[in-house]
Amino acid sequence: MRRRARAILATASLLTAGVVAAPAVQARPSGADGEGIVVWNAQVSRAQLPLLLEAGADAQELGAALPAKGSAGVELYLTKSQAAALRGKGVDLTEHKVSAQAANRLKAAGDGVFRPYSGRNGLKQEILDTGRTHPDLAKVESIGKTVNGQDILAVKLTKGATKSRDGSKPATLYLSNQHAREWITPEMTRRLMHYYLDNYGKDPRITKIVDSTELWFVISANPDGYDYTFTPGNRLWRKNLRDNNGDGKITSADGVDPNRNFPYKWGYDDEGSSPDPTSETYRGPSAGSEPETKALDSFEKRVHFNYAINYHSAAELLLYGVGWQVATPTPDDVIYKSLAGTPDKPAIPGYHSEVSSALYTTNGEADGHAANVNGTMMFTPEMSTCTTVSKEDPADEWNPADCPSDFNFPDSEKLIQAEFQKNIPFALSVAETAAHPDRPSSSVGIDAPDFTPDTFATSYTRDDDQEVAVTVRKSVRDKTLNYRINGGRRHTEELEPWQGGKVFGGHDNIRFDQYRAKVEDADAGDRVQVWFTGRTAAGQPTSSTPFTYTVAERPKGDTLVLADEGGTAPAKNAALYTRALADNGKKAAVWDVATQGTPSALGVLSHFRNVLWYTGDAQPSAATMFAVRDFVNEGGKLINTGEQAGGSVDLGDGALSDDFSQYYLGAYNKAGLKSPPAFAGAGRLAGAKASLAAAPGRPLTAAGAYTITSDTLKPDRFPQFASASAGDYPGVRTPFEPAEGSWFAAAEHRDDAYMRLARTVDLTGATAAQKPSLDLQLSYDTEPGYDQVIIEAHTVGQDDWTTLPDLNGGSTTSAPSQCEQGFLLKEHPFLTHYLTPGASACAASGSSGAWNRFTGSSNGWQQVSVDLAAYAGKQVEVAVSYVSDPGTGGLGAFVDDTRLVLGGAASGAEGFETALGPWNVPGPPAGSPGNSADWARSQALFHSSAAVTTRDTVLFGFGLENVPSAVDRKHLVAKALSALHR
């Protein structure tokens, strides 16, 4: 049973004379030396989202805007210095500006709807007037003070509001304006308050809601910040007005995000919130540090709201459930989905209904704290953007191109009222549900069934019981598991609530919860029918739809080999894994994803102490990853191997997530490494050694090379992610450290770049028979198809430019992807020396030369050699060039160990240890944009490891099929098992 702390607070009722004026001594707005928030347009892909989150963008405002493939335009809200830093990481930004003419026209067309909180005719005065003019239905009170001492006002709306005890009726909270710039949200709650008052006694539905429940309205949860957005240059301020450094000024380094400051999961990681005061998602110096946070927390504890809606903008989403961990369903999602709807059937037209963390995460937010600390089920609508609503009437004066930002909802009574009206059905359905909180009044007709079983078709139980799970309405009594084995008599077991796992579970279970019981005495080959029964709160019998599973024949043992080779053909390498386990005295069962599908965490994985999950050529599915995540969460131990291990999975529609790799496997980033010859263990795998080679029919082209999560998220601050390097590829430099020595030449990715590393080679005394060549080591990580490395050459003084192929076969003549669309050649017209656009593709030759390039990932350092015989007797300028398009990119291009070869003898070696030597950086050719960064000497960007260990997992960047020696395979598995069971 959920226990809710009761705070006994003295709360002042406020009428006209009851509000104390805010203190006069406050931090003042920054002057000319301060940086304001500026709107920027960026063309980005989902792969670049982590850079935007690091810069402080809110994932919930961005995620829906990014397509599964390619890139899209988004708005960012950054200072100029923040934008410069982001631009330095390769994101192409352009300041968004609205012409003075358009701004003046819109100002003249505006209806004057939006008003500050304080001051004459402000929202605060309207709130007080509402309490005075509706004494039988409304009561106004302060729930606390802001940083600057303003009252945060709440309106209680119910029959006999001033006489009834707060929280004595089922209560709903309508909350808005946590983020200062989201002006449409106070209009939503303000209008909703008046909608109830105006229709009371006229509309039976409204009258019933007001008579039987309490409706509370906090029209501005951030009055200081909201007022600040009405001052010059501060329209896009998001946070509260905490003066973080105490200098008496408000600059971009001040303020705390009120929706990242709540104690529940506060600072769980640095993706869902930021430790940086300049970030828009700065979480504050400590959990619950802000007075605005304290006010809402104590308010929720005092009133005990059943439901709440926390209005935000601007993204056209309707969010609910877990925010702190990606794609995590909960028992209460049954109700959330019934009320919010689905992506295909949303409760608010035009919005996308989904779990808060469907793609990206937040932590310390109001919703999670409300549910898991204060027992309040809270939704977050992200209301419509300026761009969207400005399109609705082509005949009006509002044009999407004139939007200063998507937060600048048009000052149009017609558009604001339309946005409000489409939100009414959802708002009313939530209030109605408060009266019977576990039986939702869905506005879209979606039921909330009493039972939702966790079904599966195959059980791998052997000599133990099979646990089954079901999500059940908590008010159902006599919750019972029923089952029959092979059609025999009915057996029953009492269902017990699941307490949760090591990381998640046991939360977000206010009205529904997961319950479990065990099926006993089923043997291999048996068919078991399962269903669940109980009695409703009214005493009526209720039951689930039955499901049936078969107990499979499988070897006795505590380890499962999870074969995940990709495709639909049966696994080829599973026997290598079972043999290595057998050599360690362990019998193993096998589950083949290709032929058996996704394994059930309960039906299959739970019956094993260890799972050895190996991957093949294909990226593992999200469904398999989630099953393995459930297994580890419930105490299982995991060994994960293969080239695809420790990378990203596709959550759907091209949305890649590496959260499982980062937070469960300890691999913060992954790169590929081509054909490492050996592995040497370290740390908990110390002493393990293995020679590596290609597997039959499959070369080792991209062995995993990982950075360690604990190197980024330090264990003293993030002990839950403790991880360590457990081995290397000896003698191999990983892709982003020098091939030799301590320095190399690096062209780190920037969008729209044409970076040249050039030198002149004097071949006036050479002959073609001497086979002159330029040799170098090259490592690159580019957006496949779209960005490239080319080696350009021309005779000094002539315009006979061409690109040179790699004599070692590393280059290709394929034209850039979508070259025919023209955007790449428009950005870099010099490329027409080598490319000719066509109707469906570009030809690999141009006005003076041929096209040869490197694209994608080199998976480590490659030896490259280009033939210079055509320039014998001349001087030739050669350039290693990194050329990128306007969209996303990889890490860039890297060069080391350059040398000239003439007659088989190398000379003029340059490894960039002290200088660029004969090389120079001439900048982009005429017609290309200027580079925001260029080639430069660099030390290692980072070191990557071949294996990683955590408390519960061991990760290898290669598979046992890449280990020719059975003895080595045995020892690797032995070390991994020992590391997991110390």
Task: Mark where each language-model region is.
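Secretory targeting and sorting signals
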Residues: 1-27
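Metallocarboxypeptidase
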Residues: 230-241, 245-247, 251-447
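Extracellular ligand-binding/catalytic regions of CAZymes and related secreted enzymes
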Residues: 295, 416-435, 552-558, 671, ...
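Aromatic-Pro/Gly-enriched surface loop or interdomain linker
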Residues: 533-610, 614, 643, 664, ...
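A glycine-rich, often tryptophan-bearing local segment used as a flexible ligand/cofactor-contacting loop or short
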Residues: 613, 618-708
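Extracellular glycan-recognition surfaces and repeat-rich motifs
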Residues: 687-755, 784, 802-862, 910-944
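Extracellular beta-strand-rich recognition modules
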Residues: 770-781, 789, 793, 875-884, ...
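Extracellular carbohydrate recognition
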Residues: 786-788, 859, 884-902, 966-970
